[in-house]
Amino acid sequence: MDFQGSIPTYIYDIDYSMSAPCQKVNVKQIAAQLLPPLYSLVFIFGFVGNMMVFLILISCKKLKSMTDIYLFNLAISDLLFLLTLPFWAHYAANEWVFGNIMCKLFTGIYHIGYFGGIFFIILLTIDRYLAIVHAVFAIKARTVNFGVITSVVTWVVAVFVSLPEIIFMRSQKEGSHYTCSPHFLHIQYRFWKHFQTLKMVILSLILPLLVMVICYSGILNTLFRCRNEKKRHRAVRLIFAIMIVYFLFWTPYNIVLLLTTFQEYFGLNNCSSSNRLDQAMQVTETLGMTHCCLNPVIYAFVGEKFRNYLSVFFRKHIVKRFCKHCSIFQQVNPDRVSSVYTRSTGEQEVSTGL
């Protein structure tokens, strides 16, 4: 498959898009050995972390704020994305054996989860901006109802931008094996290939970073007027960590994606360069996937409020079930945890929202 998009990239034996057929047996062999264990690790760690966020929000926090709504939907997006990885891992090691319907279904789930995760990260960034920079306005604007409405709209947008991948993906026999790959009419191939790549780069890198720069610049300006220097320094460090982590995890993939799609314009449309780009795609794509493992840490567990709920959940559901005589760990007062953090000022958002 010589089309490069956000679907996990599997390279087959020959690339016919070159002027002369390009043998890619070695690239496929490396993918078969490298990708399944990496995808498995991403699936395990990402599933555990996001499932913990999901369960805590349902059982402890009860989705009482707009932030909770967005965190809940971010966890769902990451879980949808992650649930497809075992199938892509099998595909990387073998061939596509799940049929055409499942090819389209898993492609759709993968992309909807992928774009949904990006969009909810953007909404969380805007939510923090409103809470800290426009604290008085945020009291009226940041409601559960508004969070639900914007979440529904976000899912609709995520489905819409995923439609081209769902429509064009098809399972068919190519040579001696079955593939799950996009199939365009020959006259449309170049247009859709460029369109998909530019859509990916704009939605997954340029737009999120633009929103982060604008919102976090406003937040930093407000934080520098905060009287509590300790909270200010902690919040500033977290802001830079969020931006740097997102940039480091997704920029390499998007750069390689651009180079691969427009390789003829960079003088890279030869077999050796194509093979190196394919190998780089495998590494950078997996690196980008691991970002969903960090979302629970960056957007949930880093907050003091959420860590208290995690402690309550652990004691109530884990310790109580597996250590019935450990009474010291079961002395939990959930009401106290929820009542400690009821203030809604800008400074409180600095300490708990960030």
UniProtKB/Swiss-Prot annotation:
A lipid is attached at residues 323, 326 (S-palmitoyl cysteine). Sulfated on at least 2 of the N-terminal tyrosines. Sulfation is required for efficient binding of the chemokines, CCL3 and CCL4. Residues 61-70, 127-143, 221-237, 304-354 are cytoplasmic. Its main location: membrane. It is a multi-pass membrane protein. It is found in: Cell membrane. The chain crosses the membrane at residues 33-60, 71-91, 105-126, 144-168, 201-220, 238-262, 280-303. Interacts with PRAF2. Efficient ligand binding to CCL3/MIP-1alpha and CCL4/MIP-1beta requires sulfation, O-glycosylation and sialic acid modifications. Glycosylation on Ser-6 is required for efficient binding of CCL4. Interacts with GRK2. Interacts with ARRB1 and ARRB2. Interacts with CNIH4. Interacts with S100A4; this interaction stimulates T-lymphocyte chemotaxis. Receptor for a number of inflammatory CC-chemokines including CCL3/MIP-1-alpha, CCL4/MIP-1-beta and RANTES and subsequently transduces a signal by increasing the intracellular calcium ion level. May play a role in the control of granulocytic lineage proliferation or differentiation. Participates in T-lymphocyte migration to the infection site by acting as a chemotactic receptor. PANTHER family: C-C CHEMOKINE RECEPTOR TYPE 5 (PTHR10489:SF686), CELL ADHESION MOLECULE (PTHR10489). This is C-C chemokine receptor type 5. It comes from Rattus norvegicus (Rat). The lineage of its organism: Eukaryota, Metazoa, Chordata, Craniata, Vertebrata.
